[in-house]
């Protein structure tokens, strides 16, 4: 990836995950600037050689003006204030990337009228361990070099996929943005069940986390096999696995998952109207 000067507005967990992922790939730290009001976060980043500024309007505006790329890594309710503070900046020759949930490209364009090159990103928390999944959307006018740069940027912390319709970002939210929590809940339930069977907590956690990791790896390493086939391959008729799956099917697990993901989509749609 050809390095560009990047200014991050916000230095929270997701911003740090991206920054540290870039640094691990050899991205020059002096090409990265972070604006954040938290002194401890700035210190942590500065120790890695990253430029930092306090979140004052003047310092932030100066940092953005001298950068080729602006990456908005703040909560969606802060977007309006952040963009207002950058109203004097000319974005016509800059790439703007937003990881603020629920903030549409159209809304960003209205907040930053001179910005013509905008990418909306929905990352997820496994980016913190370089195993993230990010959905990306941009209008057709996005320059190819900016599209590639954004993809490379997010690939530093996992995998990426592009959608051609912004409405699909709601589905991305259900499929990857929020989905780590679904897996955490299922793993939590398994751990609790084992503990109720007199398994100690540490051993129960080990059994669950390694089984989850192994199952995910089998899916990844067998791309031509449907996930259903992998399930069928470990389910012997009349066996222990079949007994467990019968209960899950009786409780309509698949229907519950579908309902949960639909609720996620609907809430994402509602949030987009708020910001």
Swiss-Prot record:
GO molecular function annotation? pyrroline-5-carboxylate reductase activity
**Signal peptide location:** none
Q: Which GO terms describe its cellular component?
A: cytoplasm
Q: Which enzyme class, named as a word?
A: oxidoreductase
| An individual GO BP term | L-proline biosynthetic process
The main location is cytoplasm
Ranges in coiled-coil conformation: none
The entry sums up its family as follows: Belongs to the pyrroline-5-carboxylate reductase family.
Protein name, please?
Answer: Pyrroline-5-carboxylate reductase
